[in-house]
Swiss-Prot record:
Keywords on record: Cytoplasm, DNA-binding, Transcription, Transcription regulation
Transcription regulation in keyword set: yes
Gene Ontology biological process: regulation of DNA-templated transcription
Keyword DNA-binding: yes
Recorded family membership: Belongs to the TACO1 family.
Major location category of this protein: cytoplasm
Protein name (record): Probable transcriptional regulatory protein MS0710
Annotated PANTHER family: TRANSCRIPTIONAL REGULATORY PROTEIN YEBC-RELATED, TRANSLATIONAL ACTIVATOR OF CYTOCHROME C OXIDASE 1
Cellular compartments per GO CC: cytosol
UniProt-annotated location(s): Cytoplasm
Amino acid sequence: MAGHSKWANIKHRKAAQDAQRGKIFTKLIRELVTAAKIGGGDAGSNPRLRAAVDKALASNMTRDTINRAIDRGVGGGDDTNMETRIYEGYGPGGTAVMVECLSDNANRTISQVRPSFTKCGGNLGTEGSVGYLFNKKGLIIIDAGADEDALTEAAIEAGADDIQPQDDGSFEIYTAWEELGDVRDGIEKAGFKIAEAEVSMIPTTSVDLDAETAPKLLRLIEMLEDCDDVQNVYHNGEISDEVAALL
């Protein structure tokens, strides 16, 4: 699958950079508040909230801060009127890009997102322009070192749709997005440690990028992730090991 395991190092590096600037905490708190408002404050029965809590803990957010954000979401109020907005567009090399935002002001958000596409040789599209190239799925990451046969058996037993070993030894497990929480619980009960679990947009096709185009896509991703309202960026660009070595 393009746009996921091959970009794990980029994702983690960006997370560290955002943390230094304080941006990641703002984004995480927004997600905690929104997830609690929509699905309730019990992470055990709210997969979106559970994923948000896990991300917050991984970023060294304190339990107290997390709980306060959840309480805000459950309590409602004017400061919780965030809506999920999805923007679709074309990036360098004809790549399909989907931008997931949490925002209380659509005009502000679009004024952040549109220039990012324009400056990187892409263009913002209309609703549905590239969405058909992605499937909404649950994605579970298991770090390297797990026994493949045992993990495969546990994943299938838990209800997973597919499991794919990665070049770095890790595993990506795909589920129906509605069943992410149940599959995660089943895999954990089988004794496997989950590195990450989230609802994601998985590309159905990929676009191979050359050494000239790849940096432009990476720049677009960075610019979008720098926008305060942007929570996630999904794309179908793929960079070969040969091209990556030239970057």
